[in-house]
Amino acid sequence: MKSPHVLVFLCLLVALVTGNLVQFGVMIEKMTGKSALQYNDYGCYCGIGGSHWPVDQTDWCCHAHDCCYGRLEKLGCEPKLEKYLFSVSERGIFCAGRTTCQRLTCECDKRAALCFRRNLGTYNRKYAHYPNKLCTGPTPPC
């Protein structure tokens, strides 16, 4: 069991980490053991934008994340800019934020990070920095 001092320090450390991209990256790394950069520009959906058919289950995680952010934007949120707080424990990821948009953004990121973890076996380095021109097929609905 960790000492109370270590737990307090870890809570403070998590509380100091704010900024959506930073948080999402930390979530990804904690859930997968991979650098968040390994998911940037992966397949047809991971990174900025997305179109055509996802290349694998990892890419489907990014498609779902894009859809989640799209729903938040329709509610008037700015998920790419929302800053929120979260913590990670053996029991999962816990989201917090002052506003509904912050909490919902955290939930989108949480679902994506957990999806990446569930689908670690589908991650294929050949889809890293995948050229968009190689993406084919219809664009699936959200």
Swiss-Prot record:
What name does this protein carry?
Group IIE secretory phospholipase A2
Q: Tell me which residues bind Ca(2+) 1.
A: Y45, G47, G49, D66
User: What does the entry comment about cofactor binding?
Assistant: Binds 2 Ca(2+) ions per subunit. One ion binds at a conserved binding site (GCXCG), whereas the second ion binds at a flexible site and may act as a supplemental electrophile as well as a backup.
Query: What is expression of this protein induced or repressed by?
Result: Up-regulated by inflammatory cytokine IL1B.
PANTHER family the UniProt entry points to = GROUP IIE SECRETORY PHOSPHOLIPASE A2, PHOSPHOLIPASE A2 FAMILY MEMBER
The disulfide bridges present are C44-C135, C46-C62, C61-C115, C67-C142, C68-C108, C77-C101, C95-C106
Per the Swiss-Prot or TrEMBL record, the active site comprises H65, D109
Cited InterPro entries = PLipase_A2, PLipase_A2_dom, PLipase_A2_dom_sf, PLipase_A2_His_AS
SUPFAM superfamilies in the cross-refs: Phospholipase A2, PLA2
Q: What class of enzyme is it?
A: hydrolase
Q: Which domain of life is it from?
A: Eukaryota
Name of the gene encoding the protein in the UniProt record: PLA2G2E
The record's principal subcellular location, in a coarse class, is secreted
- UniProt tissue specificity: Restricted to the brain, heart, lung, and placenta.
